[in-house]
Amino acid sequence: MRASSSNGTTPWSWRHPSRYFQRNHRKLLVIDERELFLGGFNIRLENSIGLYGEGRKRDTHVSISGDLARHAAALFDQMWQDAEHPYADFATEEGTVFDPFLVPSFSCLGWKRIACLYAGLIERSAHRVYITTPYFCPGSIVDTAVRQAARRGVDVRLLVPRDSDPSFVGWLTRSGYSRMMAEGVHIYQYVAPRKLHAKTAVIDDEWCVIGSPNLDHLSLLVNHELVLIARDPGLGSALTEQFYRDLADASEVKPNAWAKRGWTERGLEAVGWTARKIL
């Protein structure tokens, strides 16, 4: 067994100071270049059904076999090299495009790549967009696509935790509620004892997005992330059914009730709105 000398972060360098804030946020397992597992699932105690039972985190992971596993192995090797030699210049190859396909972000090499793909799928939606994410403060590209889709009559639903971890991230998410609901976006807060950690989207029961990125600036613009995009009605149906099951453990935020929230909450959201651009 070999372990990388990196702990998922990049050491400080005066030549590359911005890279200090980057981290490897991917959740990827590849077995013999035959099968890959990816999504939001971390290998940690909080995900153990034996230790936490029904209190474990609510997450989504997917398993895929075939050529895509070899592509995932190549992406892993590239990240391993970057961890061992963080400031070396490595040539990158796009590789073969598969359906479904993997979308990596390498910060400066893939700046806004995942955000643009997310927004592009939402912009092409015709009937419904169901998004599950622990944090929703994605920046203007995705935020605008979500609101415009709702405005043109698409059934847009956003599932986020009621209680965020850490708590202040909830201020960032909630600071955008009013604007989204004004455009017709339906917002649901997950209230089950389990913490919501899944990062998925399903568009028109057909296009599916599963991976490691949260819909926030750190994931979309800074971190090393990996996402699967698939046009698969079978997977889309499964994700839609899971979304409906999650809604049974969620409560919808109603615009009239939201307008009556207290000034303390409004003040915290104002702080969150200001911080959205950096977090």
Where are the predicted features?
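Charged, low-complexity intrinsically disordered terminal segments
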Residues: 1-279
